């Protein structure tokens, strides 16, 4: 039994000891396939799994997200997953783990894949059919399935043999026979791709070529992945026979040729198909062309853009992945797209003259960084409609406001009663990812004076779904949506076009079609490099020049994942970059040019120019390494390897040549440069960071005829240990200075208490100096001093109310998804935390000190050391964020270590004449009387408040300072009293909202046990009727990506409803009786289709008497005496028939006639056979079906009559909501 005090206890959540505030997507919110953070988290898990040998578990989680949770798009995840291609992985390579991702049935995890799991090829078929605007024929299905079945068999053999080798300890532990078996499988797979790939795009029919291209793109990716493994892992597998150095050189040639071939093929087939659509003349042709572009982009072009990254010479294996951002935008097919019920799109003109950046389909579409959506303003008008002459809206115009301008599509209403306008405010942090619309296609019943031109798709209902699953209502009636357009996964609506219908009367000009611009979420992120992951790996980053802040002209490209920037002679372009980690980076540029062009390249860090020189960008026309696209052949050019400091900087590029230059992207490859053999200037560059846990192949290279004036270099992966040589103190003066500083850490006359003003960072500065004392000269002294410093550190930890103030206990902190701890910083002895730029996830750390740790009427000091910070907010709160400061701290360079001077930075004078350290912060917070019941404690957090901000912080402390004076006690009592009043007011409000819901959910379950079984008489409607309340604070006050206490309550409510719903689904004989999976499991006749009601519910709509759905069920352990109950919830006039019997057919008919949503039942049904066909039909006009269930009747009691009773209950406008 759930009771109020369990869900909403008198003591709020205990941050450290109890269940912590969980991340929003992990606690029952409506995660959507648009949420890029979910893909990033699953990708991190896969990366860890590949290196740890647990990748099958990571892939199982992905498959669950795809086929069970419906939060992951298969195609999108695979595409993002290819960024792992450059990882330094074990000898299994990258292809083996991906087999289980491409073919769900081959993922060797303990738990079987979801029962509805498909391979990626089968999962593509609905999109392919949508693209070619028809279903696949039986011959086409046979052809595609046969080819993929052959590949799956070969992949399974490859995987099985690799598993066998690994089970024996690896390639150096098995005999030559098993190695030969494996290499045979490798070569067989390679031959399959070489031989069979062309058959997918060589056919006499255009449709066959187009439908085969998505298969071709995936298969080409698989082949290039296999070839890369052969090149990088082949010498480990079999260096003597099949993968000798000469053979590897041959495979290198193959991968380069195939990258060009596969890219050209996809581009040529796409362009040929695109040309066949011509210039759209009406909405019908426009919709088909845009759908073709959308699916070809997400299923083909987005894969082809990654092909060059498979070349290990161009993108060598390191310990980090590769991230090449895409900025290309996609136009949706026009909305509405349904053509049933009399809506004809042929010959319906489309007017694009008012569309910014459209340029007849050849433009770049509105730049999402320049035009940020702010608001939609809708202008509806009203006409007589259904059900007793009620007025129904239709949309005349929509006004789109962005950060640049306001633009009107359509015209303001001139006829009929007018209402509105209605406003839809848009939150850029929670963008729109789905548009739901209803359109009139036939005159409503009883509508007098109806104008037939309004039959051509007038909008009568409109709403929008946001990324977090919440819905924005446009304030229009209609109640449901017959058109649902979901933007491609990980995209958002960055702009909205509209087009009017042109008619010959005064209804001309009303808006009937909307066109959305879909933009990848990463397109608006700042350009960040040097951000390490949890293992310290730094990714290679590539940013489209389309993200430049000035200069150049946007030109269309299809294969790059971004439009190119054309730089005419004399023009310049600048792109802003933020570097998180001071580091060496190889700066590269991908470009195309028809002739040689001198280019001035300037990397401007604001105080230096690591690159400031003219560089020749050679003609790429005849390049053997390039990929030909719309504006030329694109190649990657290395500019220079330089050290770039942490912070923001600009890259400026000026075309000083005489012909156009086309810039695709700029890349930053993290490097460490080691210098060997100073006499002959031989240098070795290796990818950073070095992973000393990996086993690398040693390649010996002889260099002869070295020219000391012209150093030569080699690129390789180097595994080594680099000793950090600290200075050594050898004089008695050094010893006296350091001894004095060690003694100064303690209060006078004791070594059991720290001095009053000593911070944790002070102790760490001293230990650096102690460690630098010479072992040979001062060994005994050093040991004694180090013992004292260790004692000081223990005392510091003991007084610190924070757990893990130097991050020795990282689990004690709440942190943003991308926040990491880092070691080996010149200013820190201990680990420090790196707060990176926020990106899609907030960047923070947070901890709460519980009330039980505090003393009454006491002042506490909150302090810490900041090595570097840009836009770092420091928040300390007890009664309401008493301390809230945003600080900027310059990058702290370590001074040469001396025995007397500071480690970092020259102290500056403060207002009271003392010396202060700009890197050290210290604040005070007062605690009055203790309040154990409400447990306010002291909450402490650091977070980044701007997109390009960052910080490195450590030595965080909350420690007791002194007792409060009398006047300070009075002040804090007044603040505490006000806080308690507001707290109790909100608590009373929340209690009044949640107690009724607790009571209703208790009523669903036997013995009111939310983890037990639901009662036998529970129906879908009982669950749907429970409307979750809108609580005032669902998100944590500081951690915006986590639930508050109230949010956790809502998650528990939703979890209990979900469990009840799942049990009901298991108990009913009908599959998908709630129509949550569209009309799956039902046979449709006529125009039965799903719509979305205004409250967000998805229901089945039967528009007239010619529409019906049916389902045949088979009862296990059939008993003709067993009784069943039919429960139906719907609106309108219709019937449910149940046909059963073998030799003699019996039909049971249940009639449902209700103007509002109502539950009706038929009890005590018996059947004459184990097969029953259930049919739902409309009798007259629109019939809306919310849910239907057929369940075993409970055993009757004495006062029950089961003679086919019929009952009903009315419940209009009810829903199961999860308000955010």
From Swiss-Prot:
One of its GO terms (molecular function) is toxin activity. Residues 1194-1220 are annotated as: Disordered. GO terms for biological process: sporulation resulting in formation of a cellular spore; symbiont-mediated killing of host cell. It comes from the Bacteria. Gene3D superfamilies: Galactose-binding domain-like, Pesticidal crystal protein, N-terminal domain. CDD domains: delta_endotoxin_C. Keywords: Sporulation, Toxin, Virulence. Residues 1198-1220 have a biased composition (Polar residues). InterPro entries: Cry_V, Galactose-bd-like_sf, Pest_crys_dom-III, Pest_crys_dom_I, Pest_crys_N_sf. Toxic segment of the protein is located in the N-terminus. Promotes colloidosmotic lysis by binding to the midgut epithelial cells of hymenopteran species. Belongs to the delta endotoxin family. This is Pesticidal crystal protein Cry5Ac. It comes from Bacillus thuringiensis. The gene is cry5Ac.
């Amino acid at each position: 039994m759930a009771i109020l005090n369990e869900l909403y206890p008198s003591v709020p959540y205990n941050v450290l000891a109890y269940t912590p505030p969980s991340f929003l997507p992990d606690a029952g919110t409506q995660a959507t396939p648009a949420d890029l953070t979910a893909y990033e988290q699953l990708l991190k898990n896969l990366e860890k799994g590949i290196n740890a040998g647990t990748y099958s578990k990571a892939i199982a989680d992905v498959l669950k997200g795809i086929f069970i949770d419906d939060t992951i798009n298969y195609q999108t995840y695979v595409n993002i997953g290819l960024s792992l291609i450059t990882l330094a992985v074990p000898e299994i390579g990258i292809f083996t783990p991906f087999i289980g991702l491409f073919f769900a049935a081959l993922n060797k995890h303990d738990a079987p894949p979801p029962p509805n799991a498909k391979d990626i090829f089968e999962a593509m078929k609905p999109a392919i059919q949508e693209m070619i605007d028809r279903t696949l024929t039986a011959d086409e299905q046979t052809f595609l399935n046969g080819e993929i079945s052959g590949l799956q068999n070969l992949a399974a053999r490859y995987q099985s043999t690799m598993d066998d080798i690994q089970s024996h300890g690896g390639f150096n532990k098995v005999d030559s026979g098993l190695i030969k078996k494996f290499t045979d499988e490798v070569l067989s797979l390679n031959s399959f791709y070489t031989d069979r790939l062309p058959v997918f795009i060589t056919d006499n029919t255009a449709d066959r070529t187009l439908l085969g291209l998505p298969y071709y793109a995936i298969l080409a990716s698989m082949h290039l992945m296999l070839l890369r493994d052969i090149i990088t892992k082949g010498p480990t597998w079999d260096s003597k026979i099949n993968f000798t150095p000469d053979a590897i050189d041959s495979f290198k040639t193959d991968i380069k040729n195939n990258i060009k071939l596969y890219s050209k093929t996809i581009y040529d087939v796409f362009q040929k198909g695109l040309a066949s659509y011509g210039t759209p003349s009406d909405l019908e042709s426009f919709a088909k062309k845009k759908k073709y572009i959308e699916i070809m982009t997400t299923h083909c072009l987005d894969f082809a853009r990654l092909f060059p990254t498979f070349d290990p010479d161009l993108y060598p294996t390191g310990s980090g992945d590769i991230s090449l951002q895409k900025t290309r935008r996609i136009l949706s097919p026009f909305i509405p797209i349904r053509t049933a019920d009399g809506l004809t799109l042929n010959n319906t003109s489309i007017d694009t003259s008012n569309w910014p950046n459209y340029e007849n389909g050849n433009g770049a579409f509105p730049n999402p960084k320049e035009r940020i959506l702010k608001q939609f303003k809708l202008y509806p008008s009203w006409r007589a409609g259904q059900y007793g002459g009620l007025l129904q809206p239709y949309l005349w115009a929509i006004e789109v406001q962005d950060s640049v301008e306001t633009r009107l599509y359509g015209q303001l209403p001139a006829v009929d009663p007018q209402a509105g306008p209605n406003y839809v405010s848009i939150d850029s942090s929670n963008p729109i990812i789905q548009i739901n619309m209803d359109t009139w296609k036939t005159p409503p019943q009883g509508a007098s004076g109806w104008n037939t031109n309004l039959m051509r798709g007038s909008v009568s209902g409109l709403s929008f779904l946001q990324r977090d699953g919440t819905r924005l209502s446009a304030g229009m009636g209609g109640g449901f949506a017959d058109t649902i357009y979901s933007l491609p996964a990980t995209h958002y609506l960055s702009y909205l076009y509209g087009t009017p219908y042109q008619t010959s009367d005064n209804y001309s000009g009303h808006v009937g079609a909307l066109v959305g611009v879909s933009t990848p979420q990463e397109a608006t992120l700042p350009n960040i490099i040097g951000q390490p992951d949890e293992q310290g790996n730094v990714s290679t980053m590539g940013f489209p020049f389309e993200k430049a802040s000035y200069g150049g002209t946007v030109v269309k490209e299809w294969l790059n994942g971004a439009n190119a920037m054309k730089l005419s002679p004399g023009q310049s372009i600048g792109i802003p970059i933020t570097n998180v980690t001071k580091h060496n980076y190889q700066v590269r540029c991908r470009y195309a040019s028809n002739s040689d062009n001198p280019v001035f390249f300037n990397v401007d860090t604001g105080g230096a120019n690591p690159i400031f020189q003219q560089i020749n960008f050679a003609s790429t026309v005849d390049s053997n390494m390039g990929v030909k696209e719309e504006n030329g052949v694109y190649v990657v050019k290395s500019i220079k390897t330089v050290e770039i400091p942490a912070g923001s900087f600009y890259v400026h590029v000026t075309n000083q040549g005489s012909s156009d230059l086309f810039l695709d992207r700029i890349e930053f490859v993290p490097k460490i440069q080691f210098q060997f053999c100073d006499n002959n200037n031989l240098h070795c560059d290796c990818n950073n960071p070095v992973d000393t846990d990996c086993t690398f192949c040693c390649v010996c290279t002889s260099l002869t005829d070295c020219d000391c004036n012209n150093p030569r270099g080699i690129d390789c992966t180097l595994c080594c240990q680099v000793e950090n040589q600290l200075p050594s103190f050898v004089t008695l003066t050094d010893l006296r200075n350091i001894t004095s500083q060690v003694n100064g850490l303690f209060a006078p006359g004791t070594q059991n208490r720290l001095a009053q003003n000593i911070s944790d960072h002070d102790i760490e500065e001293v230990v650096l100096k102690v460690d630098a004392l010479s072992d040979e000269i001062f060994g005994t002294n050093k040991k004694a001093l180090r013992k004292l410093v260790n004692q000081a550190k223990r005392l510091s930890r003991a007084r610190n109310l924070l757990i893990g103030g130097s991050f020795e206990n990282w689990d004690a902190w709440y942190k943003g998804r991308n926040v990491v701890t880092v070691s080996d910083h010149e200013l820190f002895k201990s680990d420090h935390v790196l707060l990176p730029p926020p990106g899609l996830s907030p960047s923070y750390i947070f901890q709460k000190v519980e009330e039980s740790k505090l003393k009454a009427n006491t002042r506490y000091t909150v302090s810490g050391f900041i090595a570097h910070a840009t836009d770092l907010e420091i928040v300390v709160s007890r009664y309401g964020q008493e301390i809230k400061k945003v600080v900027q701290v310059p990058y702290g360079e370590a001074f040469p270590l001396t025995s007397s001077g500071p480690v970092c930075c020259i102290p500056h004078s403060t207002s009271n004449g003392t010396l202060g350290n700009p890197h050290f912060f210290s604040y005070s917070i007062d605690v009055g009387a203790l309040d154990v019941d409400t447990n306010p404690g002291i909450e402490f957090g650091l977070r980044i408040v701007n997109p390009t901000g960052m910080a490195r912080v450590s030595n965080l402390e909350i420690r007791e300072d002194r007792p409060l004076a009398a006047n300070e006690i009075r002040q804090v009592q007044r603040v505490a009293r006000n806080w308690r009043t507001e707290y109790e007011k909100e608590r009373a409000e929340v209690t009044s909202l949640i107690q009724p819901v607790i009571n209703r959910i208790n009523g669903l379950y036997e013995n009111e046990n939310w983890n037990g079984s639901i009662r036998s008489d529970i129906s879908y409607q009982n669950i749907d009727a429970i409307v979750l309340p809108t609580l005032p604070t669902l998100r944590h006050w500081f951690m915006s990506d986590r639930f508050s206490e109230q949010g956790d309550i809502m998650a528990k409510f939703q979890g209990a409803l979900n469990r009840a719903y799942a049990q009901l689904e298991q108990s009913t004989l009908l599959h998908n009786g709630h129509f949550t999976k569209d009309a799956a499991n039902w046979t449709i006749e006529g125009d039965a289709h799903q719509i979305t009601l205004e409250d967000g519910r998805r229901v089945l709509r039967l528009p007239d008497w010619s529409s019906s759905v049916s389902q045949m069920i088979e009862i296990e352990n059939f008993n003709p005496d067993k009784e069943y109950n039919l429960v139906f919830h719907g609106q309108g006039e219709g019937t449910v028939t149940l046909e059963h019997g073998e030799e003699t057919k019996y039909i049971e008919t249940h009639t449902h006639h209700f103007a509002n949503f109502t539950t009706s039942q038929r009890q005590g049904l018996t059947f004459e056979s184990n097969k029953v066909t259930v049919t739902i039909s409309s009798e007259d006009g629109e019939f809306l079906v919310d849910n239907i269930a057929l369940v075993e009747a409970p055993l009757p009691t004495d006062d029950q009559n089961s003679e086919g009773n019929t009952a009903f209950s009315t419940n209009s406008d009810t829903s199961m909501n999860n308000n955010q």
